[in-house]
Amino acid sequence: MSENKTSLSYKDAGVDIDAGNQLVERIKSVTKKTHRPEVKGNLGGFGALCELPTKYKKPLLVSGTDGVGTKLRVAMDANRHDGVGIDLVAMCVNDLIVQGAEPLFFLDYYATGKLDVDVAASVVTGIGAGCEQAGCALIGGETAEMPGMYHDGDYDIAGFCVGVVEADNVIDGTNVKPGQKLIALGSSGPHSNGYSLVRKIIEVSGADVNAELNGKPIIDQLLEPTRIYVKSVLALLEEVQVSAISHITGGGFWENIPRVLPEDAKVVIDEKSWEWPAVFSWLQENGNVTRHEMYRTFNCGVGLVIVVDDADTEQAVNILKQHGENAWVIGDIASKDGEEQVEINA
């Protein structure tokens, strides 16, 4: 046996602990900006501690986890990483708010083949910005450098969020009934869904994503961060009784709206009530995508659908607009008269 063996280190195997520590130091200021009084302890412990807000009498915890999907590939190809952190938070907190839950805290998971501290810091800075928008604390996370699992420049991210709602105020769709109105909240773009189709459309059509569409580069519109609806919806819930909320994500209108409807109800949507943002028409045209497939894959300009009583409609729209939302009446609740629970009238 040779006495001149090379001494190997973790860094020789492709894992740079020093780079990981450097990242932690860079993101400490990000987490501080998101602090909530319920959070105890500092970043870096084995676990994060959080009390329940004292204002809740019968608190129920609501949890969710999500990712950004292949929008990451578009972001990596464009070398633009700041927006996907906001996307990550949005996909989680918007799922919580549809049940009436206030997001409390958020954790992230960042996995890569070779840690680029600048890229990772950009992503986490975006996560912090998203948490600020949602009013939740970024209390921890995991950075995994895994050589051989990912190409060096690639990464994946996942988010985990916990919120709280008063047990008597959970929004679950049980109070939905015919005659109620649907209010749409406008999206900022495709949000974080349908990007495998987006990429296929770009590939097949050969379209130049750096070209301008309505005065703005297409790539900017595709990478526009997902809108976070938390604060505007929480403000609405203070004033108006809401029967259901649907987050229009993967599966589009056809899949997501029925998730919050009773079996005997359907929605009747007036397609004339809004105009698709230009990026969706561009995708449909360049991919020759059918209308049905567009509504099955993309949000087509509608990020949330909220169900309220007819008498509360005007007040609800006004509150949402006062909090910066593009809100409008998009349709009605009706009795189901067939198999379909979503009817979109052109």
UniProtKB/Swiss-Prot annotation:
Top-level taxon of the source organism: Bacteria
Protein location: Cytoplasm
SUPFAM superfamilies per the UniProt record, alphabetical: PurM C-terminal domain-like, PurM N-terminal domain-like
E.C. no: 6.3.3.1
Catalyzed reactions: 2-formamido-N(1)-(5-O-phospho-beta-D-ribosyl)acetamidine + ATP = 5-amino-1-(5-phospho-beta-D-ribosyl)imidazole + ADP + phosphate + H(+)
GO BP of this protein: 'de novo' IMP biosynthetic process; adenine biosynthetic process
Protein's pathway: Purine metabolism; IMP biosynthesis via de novo pathway; 5-amino-1-(5-phospho-D-ribosyl)imidazole from N(2)-formyl-N(1)-(5-phospho-D-ribosyl)glycinamide: step 2/2
Keyword entries, A-Z: ATP-binding, Cytoplasm, Ligase, Nucleotide-binding, Purine biosynthesis
Keyword Protein transport annotated: no
Disulfide partners: none
GO CC, alphabetical: cytosol
Entry GO MF terms: ATP binding; phosphoribosylamine-glycine ligase activity; phosphoribosylformylglycinamidine cyclo-ligase activity
Family statement drawn from the similarity comment of this UniProt entry: Belongs to the AIR synthase family.
NCBIfam families: purM
Name listed for the protein in its UniProt record: Phosphoribosylformylglycinamidine cyclo-ligase
